[in-house]
């Protein structure tokens, strides 16, 4: 695997991969090449898995063994996410969405998402809708 992640996964992208939904192949390829997820977005994934009766800890351990990197949510990213609020509020993007976009901007990583709302959105970070 290359040094450091090459793509940043939004919660929706990782969930699409885990559930073999539309676009999961793009996430599988990103995982092979080196992918990361913000701890904020991983919390979203864990919550959804738990709500569906799955064992988030077991699933996350498996993803980590595959090379998924979990990135801490930094002060710089928190401030960036706050700055994105007025720009993304009209689009209905959540705090988790802004956290992902902020992490991508700060770390210089393209973001993969399954959220079609992000199509055509450019806030200083490349977004790939799977």
Q: What do the predicted segments below correspond to?
A:
Residues 31, 64, 105:
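Anion (oxyanion) recognition and catalysis
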Residues 1-6, 101, 105-130:
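Acidic, PIN/NYN-like endoribonuclease modules and their adjacent C-terminal/linker elements
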Residues 9-10, 37-39, 93-95, 111, ...:
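Histidine- and aromatic-rich ligand-binding microenvironments
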Residues 1-37, 49-61:
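Short, well-structured N-terminal submotif of metal-dependent ribonuclease cores
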Residues 69-112:
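Active-site neighborhoods of divalent-metal-dependent phosphate/nucleic-acid chemistry enzymes
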Residues 24, 42, 56, 78-81:
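A general structural signal for well-ordered alpha-helical segments in protein cores
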Residues 13-14, 41, 77, 99-100, ...:
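Alpha-helix capping/helix-boundary segments
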